[in-house]
Amino acid sequence: AVMVIAIWLIAAVLGWYIGGMNLAISISKTVYHEDIRTVGSGNPGFTNFRRVYGDKYAWFIFIFDLLKGAVVCLLFGLWFRYLGFDFQLGAAYTGLFIMLGHSFPVQFSFKGGKGFLVLLSELFVLDWHAGLIAFIVMTMLLLTTKYMSLSTMCALTVGAVCLFIFRCNIPAAVSYAVCVLFMVVRHKENIKRLVKGTDNEFHLGS
């Protein structure tokens, strides 16, 4: 019983703390001596960092955020399964706190990113079929519209629906869907700009 209580608490605390590790903020402060949250769109994530500072460190941030979500969700999912719980439930529960930590990092005054990469990597852990479909949707939309925000919101929404279609653990699927909804809400300024046709475009080669 103690171990069961411990894993739920450890997953929540570690998930939030690791989720709060933000290379975009750390590198912008260390290398460029300014806070990424005060330049560009103000979002401390891969897209804004790349737009402001270029490719030099941006892809490290991209890889780190993907690994941050995938590795931690995978490890805790396996630990939950070892203790007799559903793997997907453990991974999604941990992913919920990683997302909260990424959005409201204790280390950075609770002002974090929107969490797309974290949620995409978590989706692959929950069901790689759903993750692959979401990635394809994102890629196709990004190539045709050039809008990263639109592509990510649509891709993860499709991914969340796929979890239900592929009979994912229901509490896990619901938890993931709530995270996606939360991410979409955090894109409200992007949505306003998309409606006006003024949102920033994303170009892979620039």
Language-model features and meaning:
Residues 50-55, 76-80, 97, 101, ...:
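Interfacial segments of multi-pass membrane proteins
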Residues 4-31:
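N-terminal signal-anchor transmembrane alpha helix
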Residues 25-58, 192-206:
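Cytosolic, membrane-interface loops and tails of multi-pass inner-membrane proteins
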Residues 17-26, 95-106, 181-190:
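Transmembrane alpha-helical segments that form the membrane-embedded catalytic/substrate-channel core
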Residues 5, 9-13, 59-63, 91-96, ...:
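Hydrophobic alpha-helical transmembrane segments
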Residues 51-77:
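Multi-pass membrane catalytic core of lipid/isoprenoid biosynthesis enzymes
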Residues 35-45, 107-120, 147-155:
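Short, non-helical or kinked segments that cap or interrupt transmembrane helices
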